[in-house]
Structure formats: structure tokens, C-alpha cells
Amino acid sequence: MVEANRASYLAAKAELKKTTLGTGTYDALHAMDYMVFGYLQQAQDKEAKILADEIAAIQKLNVENFVAAYSFAAIPSRLALEQRDWKKAAELKLSPSDLAWDKFPQAEAILVFSRSLGAAHTGTVQAARKDVERLHTLKDKMTTAKMGYWAGQTDFQIKAVEAWIALAEKRNDDAVRLMRAAAESEEASDKHPVTPGNVVPCRELLGEMLMALNQPAQALAEFERSLIRDPNRFWGIFGAARAAEASGNGRAARDYYAKLQTLTADRDTERPELAHAKAFLTMR
């Protein structure tokens, strides 16, 4: 995925250094989102940050469109969520600030969703609730504008955030019910060509929630199901490995940890999860 999008990115890289961007650059922005996604799955966090910093340096566009708005929202969101840096996610802000975000509620919703997940995971429930209110407002705008697909996406985003708010409030049954509903809704929808994948799959989040509730066998089933729809995801594979290990399924754990090592063979960052995988495989 990374190499397939590199040519498009390099072809327009010179334009990315300008303070105003023409329409030809949007192919590069689109490619950059795919590249950041791919880098983060392979634990090439430094490469991902280089691209994210290039995006962050852009302050003005002379032509605005959805592809650009989506990239501006998705790339910083991916960087935070794919590193499970919930504090960073909770601090996400729309940028460039003078982009007409009101024209692109479906793009703004990506960042608001990511920020609200960060808030819910860090226990700042009030901030998460405020963002849920914003998501409802954005969903209404999409519905009015006949953006049915994106309104549906925002609907399951709302459910997912409400699930993590419920978990923070120790309403565990409600949390699992809402998270499962979000996962089912997401999987009933198609992937839009603008994106390599949602910023975080709801089924993957369900697996992590079940792990937090000490239900590793159930979590393993959800991670494995998530990997069918969203294969080769760092957190999906690590989650499956960790769930298998915790549920006493050593063979499956070994297989998943080995897959994780293969996926990240060209990594530029030694994440703690990779150290755990190496330690597990060394002991077995």
C-alpha cells in the first residue's frame, strides 16, 4: 500500500511546499493518507510522522474539496489512534483553521470522533459528551445535505464513543452492547474509496473493550472477525495475540505474534507491543 501510493505523492511533493495548493495536489494528499495508514501498520512511526508534519504545515488552500478535508482530518487522527496515544487524540484540533470545514461535515466528523475516543479513554467524560453532541449536529447536517452514507458512518461513531463513555462510568453491559452495535453497523457499510480504512475499526475496539473487561476468549473471537474485514492491522493482530495468550491458547498466540513480527519487519520504531511479542516468542 505504501509503495503503490508513493509515486502519486512524489509527483506532487513540490506543490506541498507551497503556501497555497492547486487541485493537482489533492492526489498527493489522498496518497499521503494511504501511506500514513500503511506506515503505521508496519510500525514505521517516524515515516508516518514526517508525512503528518508536512500536512500540518499546510495552512491555506486556494481550492477546497472533500479529498483535502478528509486527509487533513484523517491523518492526524490516524497518527494518534494507531499509536493508541489517547491523550494526543483527546487534543486533536481541526487544521488548517481557515479551511471551510462547514462545507465538509463528514470530514470534521472523523476528527471529532477520534478526539472523543481519546477523551473517553482518558476519563474526561464531559469532553467526550461534548464531542458526541457535535457529532449529532454534524450527522444532522449530513442528513439535510443528503449525505446518507456519511450520516450512517457518523451514527456508528456516536455509538462507539457512547460505549467507551459507558465503560468509563462502569456501565459495562451498556458499553459492550453499544460497542457491538457500532461494529455491526460499520460492517454493514461499504468502504469509501477516499479512505484506506476507517481511522479505527469498531470490531477491533470491541475486542479491546472485552480485554479490558477480562474476557479474553470473547475478545479473541472479535479480533479474528475484525481481521477478516480489516486484515494486516497492527492492533488487530496484536489484540488477537494478546487475547489468545490471556485465554491460554498458546499456539494461536504464537502464530499471531509471529505475524506481527513479519508485518513490522521494516519498522523504524520499537513499540512496547513488539518487545512483548519478541519476549513471548523467545520463551516458547
Residue ranges and their predicted role:
Residues 2-10, 39-46, 52-57, 132-137, ...:
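TPR/TPR-like (Sel1-like) alpha-helical repeat modules
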Residues 10-22, 56-66, 93-105, 136-150, ...:
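Solenoid-like repeat scaffolds
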Residues 19-20, 33, 67, 113, ...:
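Alpha-solenoid helical repeat scaffolds
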Residues 34, 75, 110, 114, ...:
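"A position-specific structural signal for the A-helix of alpha-solenoid helical repeats
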